[in-house]
Amino acid sequence: MIESPHNEKLKLVRRLRERKHREREGLFATEGEDLLEAGLVAGAEPRFVLVAAGSGLEGEEVEPGLLASVSSLGSGTRVIAAWPTPESDRTQLFPHTGKNYVRFPCLYLHGVGDPGNVGTIVRTADALIDGPVVLGADCADPFSPKAVRASMGSIFSRPPLRAGVETTPEPRAALVAHGGDGLEALDGAATLCLGAEREGLPEEVLKACAVQATIPLRPGGPDSLNVAAAAAIAAQRISSLAMREGRTDA
């Protein structure tokens, strides 16, 4: 049983809270039984699994107070696992024409800096579309603790890509807070582009899009939506249309 705070695995878990160490080590950490199970179901192999002594879980036992001390959640943590960062499938990004593209389009994010939003959008994509999530400039690390928790395990089955908007399939549609066409403008889009709630999409991304669409909001309510909520609404529209049309993979 691990009883020393100087144990190398505990020190590694602490380091994995920071992006620079996750990238250097090629690892990220999860906490909780649900995320451990999600990783195993997806076929991922943890580097190691640390469990609170007396929890009855499988793994290397750690004195409970020590395990809590390296947790990003605090007390109550029963299991922490370290995993190799999964490789994204870049073959999902290639030119398409007409209806001859992946059944549901990809989501492209630019400047979405909140890891909770990134993780939630990864989960939404896993639920609604077959194409990848593509992270452009200034997006949060999808393997940060908050993003991993928000993805609810989808980070294993649908790890996002990092690429520029120019790599994504055409035609592209931009989701904008104001001044766009109705959501019907999204119909037929191969890539849905979204930006942060406050800043929106930069001009270079808007220019790469064939259309712009705006989600209609009720008068007197908020003037914009959280980007994760907007992504869910728009992705559901596109996926419903694709299922009705019976699109198939290229």
Predicted regions and their residues:
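Glycine/charged-rich beta-loop-alpha catalytic/anionic-binding loops adjacent to active sites
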Residues: G59-V62, V102-L107, A208-P219
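Short, hydrophobic beta-strand segments that form beta-sheet elements in well-ordered domains
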Residues: F28-T30, E45-A53, P160-R162, P171-A177, ...
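Structured adenosyl-cofactor binding patch, chiefly the S-adenosyl-L-methionine
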Residues: A81, T124-L128, C139-F156, E203, ...
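Short, acidic/turn-prone active-site loops that include or flank metal/cofactor-
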Residues: G54, P64-L67, D138-A140, E197-E199, ...
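N-terminal positively charged helical leader segments and presequences
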Residues: M1-V79, H96-T97, A250
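Active-site/ligand-binding-proximal alpha/beta "capping" segment
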Residues: A174-G221
